Amino acid sequence: MLFVRTKTFGIIAAVMLTVGASQAFAASLEEIKARGTMTVATEDSYKPFEYVENGKPMGLDHELLALLRKEASFKIDQQIIPWTGLLAGVATGKYDVALTAAVITPERVQSLAFTMPIADATQYYVVRADESRIKGVADLAGKSVGVQSGGASYAALADLEPTLAKTGGKLGKVVQYTSLPEAYQDLANGRLDYVINGVVNLVSLTKDQPKRFRMGEAVGAPTYAAWAVAKGNDGLLAYLDTFMAKVRASGELYALQEKWLGRAFKDMPATATK
């Protein structure tokens, strides 16, 4: 894990690759069909969207992948990898699709194109169940926070910082993690004051461990999660959007949301690109 005390978050886009690089190396839908294989990358520890349990891939995205395989005329090769490098791998063409619930951010759309959203991904904070100092967003001022390196929780700090400033507060120590389960462990052990993550993930966490964690309020603007391809790969994006529209219309997506996320997000927009 990486420890940093952060003062400003205006230039997060620097970690992403250029649009030109994305367009230069990404395989088109025609090329994928010609070679007979599409390579997708999914995360290894992103419950309830993607995770591995007893050696078996689990989660909402894995069930959506099973539906996509039934529709596809080509083989789909799934690579289960850590979060770090996943989106960059798609931007450079190493993988064709980030088949992960990637939160759509202004920085990411510089090098990636996103499908129809698959879930709400508004960022919230979570604290220990017995935490008495933090009752609202304003109380986060000066407190240590855990976020995922390069993830949407890190990007949410750009919204939280000015919110705290309105009441004279500032961000405290920011600790970045490769995966958020590490952050939850540090939170439980008192090494952090709060952790930021998407609403779905935190609902799952607090439902599974109500005696350890308590969910707080939203720390950023409404956001959504979707699959991603390299920016400019319009044919592949259209193919995936057609699939997404079909599973929405059939109700299969909403049934999977109920199963894995605890609720159906039927009011999601057709597009949520910022």
Briefly describe each language-model feature range:
Residues 62-71, 131-139, 143-152, 203, ...:
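Extended ligand-binding regions for polar small-molecule ligands
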Residues 38-39, 73-75, 91-100, 143-144, ...:
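Alpha-to-beta junction loops
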Residues 27-101, 240, 250:
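Extracytoplasmic small-molecule ligand-binding "clamshell" domains
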Residues 44, 120-127, 203-245, 261-274:
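Periplasmic-binding protein-like
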Residues 85, 102-110, 156-163, 185-188, ...:
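A ligand-binding cleft/hinge motif common to bilobed small-molecule-binding domains
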Residues 65-74, 153-176, 206-210:
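Ligand-binding cleft/hinge of the Venus flytrap
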Residues 66, 70, 75-138, 213, ...:
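Acidic, polar ligand-binding/catalytic clefts
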Residues 42-46, 79-84, 93-105, 121, ...:
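Beta->alpha turn/N-cap motifs
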